[in-house]
């Protein structure tokens, strides 16, 4: 099993990327980690080179580059070389914390989408109060979607939740402005009608965004514009909430500070619950092989989690199963 890694992509590359590999190596002894980038810089942070292949590259795609132009002009970039390795069969999957647009473009152009999938989608596992988490897609790969795109997303998300996260008959829901069947845009209503008739999907109907963190569904489907807005609202709320709680305690009386010290452990549990470090990266589902995007400011723990996520994807052959499923649907 080989995972190609863009070692130069991300805000803290290559340090956090390589340190994440060091952590993942301890648990994933059956994986060869291919690190693409500046070999000298990569070796500064490697514990050792067991199960490591370093592939020298001379270019880096940054967040300001136009994705399509960068893929075509920077062919020796760490990102393009890593994705190309998957295309050529030299690696089984790819991970990058670099430019989202460039990775999605490279995935589409090089790895290719599953033929019968109308639109691949960006999907991530987000936290819930019960600790189970939920998968939401699309998170921004597509800004506008048809009802049939949403139906494909539901199938992709359901297969991922069942095969990678081990959820039996995952509950699939559509984001809408009300739980009632009559609520939602024409696109959502059409998707609702189609999904309701599909026996292979455990479709539970509509869900409102206020109920997401309560664990009301295992897979949540929406268009890319809405999904990206919800994701950023959740991230922003979690950050502000923890900051304001800390500020209120520090600005309070001695009694308040003592109380804050007493609830330090529960607050730490809350912080861990809202953290995405252990959830892995955002998977670009609907492609012929796993392509995973880690957050640009990922910690080494987040990188290690993303690598373990990819390992599960490869072990369960979720991409292969999706290819087979959509081929059957096409007949």
UniProtKB/Swiss-Prot annotation:
It is found in: Cytoplasm. It holds the Pfam family FA_synthesis. The keyword Lyase does not apply. It comes from the Bacteria. It catalyses: a fatty acyl-[ACP] + phosphate = an acyl phosphate + holo-[ACP]. One of its GO terms (cellular component) is cytoplasm. GO terms for biological process: fatty acid biosynthetic process; phospholipid biosynthetic process. Pathway: Lipid metabolism; phospholipid metabolism. Its main location: cytoplasm. Its EC number is 2.3.1.274. It is an enzyme of class 2 (transferase). InterPro entries: FA_synthesis, Phospholipid_synth_PlsX-like. GO terms for molecular function: phosphate:acyl-[acyl carrier protein] acyltransferase activity. Keywords: Cytoplasm, Lipid biosynthesis, Lipid metabolism, Phospholipid biosynthesis, Phospholipid metabolism, Transferase. Coiled coil: none annotated. Belongs to the PlsX family. NCBIfam families: plsX. Homodimer. Probably interacts with PlsY. HAMAP family: PlsX. Catalyzes the reversible formation of acyl-phosphate (acyl-PO(4)) from acyl-[acyl-carrier-protein] (acyl-ACP). This enzyme utilizes acyl-ACP as fatty acyl donor, but not acyl-CoA. This is Phosphate acyltransferase. It comes from Lactococcus lactis subsp. lactis (strain IL1403) (Streptococcus lactis). The gene is plsX.
